[in-house]
Amino acid sequence: MFTQLDDTGYKAAIEACEAGVALFYKKLCPHCKNMEKVLDKFSGLGTGVSLFSLDIEENPAAAQEFSAERAPTILVVKNGKVTGQKAGLMNPKEMLAFYKSC
């Protein structure tokens, strides 16, 4: 389950997060919808990871801060800091490998 963030609250949510993934998306992006499903499966693997989402078009400040120009863009958050970023679609196995590498 995703927690929807916006330009006013994303910094506090990231800083308070021990383990998380943030998805920057666009509402009409089919790859973003697929990535949501991938992240749901990823979180179901018992990773204990919080899931966040931010609409790039509605939250330009957050998107600009993280240079999230393409959708979907994934941020890995560990101990309140962004430790990795990747744009594009991944499958659950690739997502797990990416998360572990960050």
Task: Give, region by region, the residue ranges found by the protein language model.
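Typically the conserved alpha-helix immediately C-terminal to a functionally engaged Cys/Sec
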Residues: K33-G46
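N-terminal "domain-start" segment that seeds a small globular fold
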Residues: M1-A12
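The canonical Cys-X-X-Cys-His
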Residues: C29-C32, I74
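Structural micro-motif
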Residues: F66-L75
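Non-catalytic, surface beta->alpha helical segment in thiol-disulfide oxidoreductase systems
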Residues: L75-C102
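Short active-site neighborhood of thiol/selenol oxidoreductases, capturing the structured segment around
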Residues: E15-K27
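CheY-like receiver
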Residues: A12-A13, A62-F66, F98
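Thiol-based oxidoreductase modules, predominantly thioredoxin-like and allied folds used
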Residues: T3-L5, F24, S43, T47-A61
